[in-house]
Structure formats: structure tokens, C-alpha cells
Amino acid sequence: MAMQHMLGFTIHPATGGGNPYVVIGVGSNRTALAPTNAPDDSYWICIINAKNPRVMVKDWIIKGSDNSKVPPGIDTYMNDPEYIFVVATKTLSTLHVPQGAFFDFLTKYGAGPELQKLEQLNVVYGCGNYGNVSYALTGQCGPRGGGKPNPPSYEKGSIYGGYSALMMMSLMPGPNGAPPYSLCDTYTWTSP
């Protein structure tokens, strides 16, 4: 059986001017998804339709100073396997890496060593030595726990303020080449 056509899937947290964004596809066949006017020192969470990943279903902007709060109503989307989620930062201060309920929420949905690295940077050096960090997390939405394997999630962090934690992956259709799409932790898109 021939490999099914995959879509490029790129997550670009912002490290300066401009918004964080997600690009689905490549070249003239690409679609960019981004928040409207995300402030510096913030998190952007977006929910993408797994049946049509060029459609953003819902998004939230979380100010860095609200780094311990989980957005109300987000679990409705995060527990539904019809969606893919993306978390991307914009010029995040080391002072505002996730804490408390927000840290637990991100961990529940797949955050691990990359986020822990940013947490360690914060507690060891504080916000004076490293001003900003960059972080991206993505995964298939769906229930976690209950004795079943969790849907896959992927993350990337950068401790270098001027360099984004750029993630390049692919979206893979089902075996018949039709949606829903799932994440593929490799850059194996095929040109249309």
C-alpha cells in the first residue's frame, strides 16, 4: 500500500513581534492559524478540527501573569478525540512559566521534559539571567487515564529568548487517505 498524502504541520511560538501561529500544508497550499493580537508574555491555546485541520475551532489567550489558571470550558474540547490541540507561547517571561493547576493541566495532556527544563531554568536562575523562553505542545485531544493509553502528545522548549521552539511535524490521514488526521512526529509530508 502506498504512503498516504500527509500535510505539513508547523508550530511557531513567537519570540518577538508578531503572533504565534500554526501552518498546515506547504507552499501555496498552506493555511496559517493564529490568534488576533496576542500580547507579549502569553500562551495561545488553539483547538483544531482533526477532520479538517485547516479549521481552528476555538482558541484562548492566557496572560503570563495568569500562569496558574486553566481556561474555563477548555476540557470540553480537550476530552474530545475529534480535535487536535496546540499550545504556543509569545515572548514568555521565565517568571511566568506554568504553575499549579495550569502546570498540572499541561502535564495531563503531555507536557514533560521540555516544560520541566523551563521550570528548572526559572527556579535555578530566576527571571534575571534568561528573560524569555519559548514553548510548544501539541497532541490529539481525547480522554486521559482510565487504564487506556493516552493519545500522543509532543513538546519542544527553548531557553534562548531569541530562538523559537519551532516544531515541524506532519498530519497523517487514516489508512484510506481520508480524515480524521493524526499527528506524526516526523516531517514526512508529501507534495500534492
Where are each of the predicted segments found?
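Short acidic-hydrophobic catalytic motif
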Residues: 1-192
